[in-house]
A protein has these predicted regions:
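Charged phosphotransfer/docking patches of two-component systems
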Residues: 11-15, 88
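Conserved beta-strand positions in the Rossmann-like core of class I SAM-dependent methyltransferases
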Residues: 5, 29-30
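Acidic, metal-coordinating helix/loop segments flanking the phosphotransfer/catalytic sites
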Residues: 18, 22, 31-49
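Non-catalytic signal-transmission and effector/linker regions of two-component phosphorelay proteins
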Residues: 1-3
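A generic structural motif
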Residues: 24-29, 74-76
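CheY-like receiver
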Residues: 39-41, 45-100
Length: 100
């Protein structure tokens, strides 16, 4: 089964995604509500998929992915959670696997 983390500043959205992933038999390793703790975690842990919100307060999801590329122990697949198509297009430029 694939492993994943969620990086989503909105608690309710993170919870909804958590339930969906568990129903799909995805092993959820962690949920983060801020990008910086997630980056620190990724520097020492491996995960298959990162579900990341684009509109986060500290650093946006696009910058978050740029930092993952520089610091992650292993490069995970990235799936962005966004309601805006223009964000999705930019995400694909950064090699996102998909968006929700």
């Amino acid at each position: 089964m694939p492993s994943a983390i969620i990086v989503e500043d909105e608690v309710l959205a993170a919870e909804r995604l958590r339930v969906l992933l568990e129903e799909c038999n995805v092993v959820l390793l962690n949920v983060f509500h801020h990008a910086m703790p997630a980056l620190e975690w990724l520097s020492v842990h491996e995960v298959d998929i990162v579900f990341a919100d684009i509109g986060m307060p500290e650093i946006d999801g696009l910058e978050f992915v740029e930092r993952i590329k520089r610091t992650a122990k292993r490069q995970p697949e990235i799936v962005f959670t966004t309601a805006y198509e223009e964000h999705a297009l930019r995400a694909f430029e950064l090699a996102a696997a998909d968006y929700l």
